[in-house]
Amino acid sequence: MTHAAASGIDSGPVTSPFDIEDYLRRVSGRVDGHLRRIAADQKRQRPARLAEAIEYALLGGGKRLRPALVLASCEALGGDPGDDGLALRFALALEMIHTYSLVHDDLPAMDDDDLRRGRPTVHKAYDEATAVLVGDGLQSLAFRHLLGTGDPRAAALAALLADGALRMVQGQALDIGAEGRKLTEDEVLELMAAKTGALISAAVVGGAIAATGSPRGLEPVGRKLGLAFQIADDLLDLTGDAAALGKRVGKDQAAGKATLPSLVGVDEARRRAGAACDEALAVLAPLGAPAEALRALARFVVTRKR
Amino acid sequence: MTHAAASGIDSGPVTSPFDIEDYLRRVSGRVDGHLRRIAADQKRQRPARLAEAIEYALLGGGKRLRPALVLASCEALGGDPGDDGLALRFALALEMIHTYSLVHDDLPAMDDDDLRRGRPTVHKAYDEATAVLVGDGLQSLAFRHLLGTGDPRAAALAALLADGALRMVQGQALDIGAEGRKLTEDEVLELMAAKTGALISAAVVGGAIAATGSPRGLEPVGRKLGLAFQIADDLLDLTGDAAALGKRVGKDQAAGKATLPSLVGVDEARRRAGAACDEALAVLAPLGAPAEALRALARFVVTRKR
């Protein structure tokens, strides 16, 4: 290690001293701790095999980007995303919805994947019926966790969660319907907005609602980051490293799936992801210092390698 | 037609002048109308195939017993289960959760059924991936419908719904784990309480919460009716008519599934269903005339032929 690196001088661009990797590490640690407690609580109920499979699915790693967006968005609007707060409950619920979608997405009848985050998928590690039930149960568990404290303020967030979850399913169905035929650019954008954009967007808006009771103008930030995230995901599938990603790459091409990079080219797709990120940053600029983490996450969404 | 039948003298037992078939017909008509509107709303969104499959699943008939229990329970406690009210929204949400569970239950990886209510199951009429997504989407849609109006009172009902849905999944998992091995009577009762009892129970308790903001002592009624309903279901599978039921009979025996009738005999199982019904009726007796429909439903649960 050079002296410069040790002293931190070269540790990031001058305009962004915020350590996003450290932030994400801290959020994951916290989210994983809570998910572990939720899974342990499930394991006190029967049957054990379902509870173990739920734990296996929930604690399989992952960047916990959606929870990070919820907490950072809450902070950005002056909220305190402390332990047991509404923002944290929403963050965990959103991650459970995301996790359920991965479990079902991997099923033989869907994407038929054997590997997820470097481990056997749930239907491989257990069986297909258990994987169906793990997904179903995680969706219920998400709503139960969010609503279980009896806090009436959770109603608006649960409605947002349900809406995002439904749009995600519509996106999956668009994706399945698209296999084997050529989508237009508009169709690809519609698919992206639903399949991935809906939950990313719900994360940003949900953090704002948890902090202030309203979306407070963050809807476009959610939409832009959702778009940027999915373009980055498609670029990583084309150009990324399977080991770093913990999943197969080149899947979209192999499945004949149209993505934005496949339609407009890698460079143009990269430019559009950057532009979407910049538009989100422009909306966040007036929020000043409290939005520092959210702005760093917006940049991470497009620059990430995993 | 004899004169006596035409004049209605023989149309029911003297102690129960309440026309439960007519009540159920009116509830189904109302529930079907609302579900049709919900499905039509989905069909304004894309993709069309998912929306059509959701409509196919939602409007496949069914007794609408759970919605009837919600509305009757609400009435029993002096509530007005009018159009667009909280009880009606909960009733529809509960029926959507029930419908999703049937769609997933019929999947090849689960019970592998080709027929449901006399029609091809969703994965037969469409395909397996669509059936997974229809179930997933219906669960989200249930919560969205219940919470979508922004009524904070919906939070408690959505928590109840989530809890019932999760217990139902645990019951399904217990059921799958039980195949091929002999369950004890306690295990069978546990399985029944979770797999079917949870939603039946949620229906009764949810109606009370919609009417008064609290379960108002109706939890035991929900539990007893859930037990009675499942025993009746198992008896119909053993002795019922496939045409009237719209599904295969003798399934449990063929699959080697332990049921209460298979463990204790048909007569004893029938006696226990009757006793559970009587216990529910005893709790409901002090509620008087407003609980007439709920008491008639309690009797229907054990006397039904479909």
Q: Where would I find each of the regions flagged by the language model?
A:
Chain A
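Mg2+-dependent prenyl diphosphate-binding active-site environment of isoprenoid biosynthetic enzymes
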Residues: 44-282, 289-302
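N-terminal amphipathic/basic leader segments beginning at the initiator methionine
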Residues: 1-39
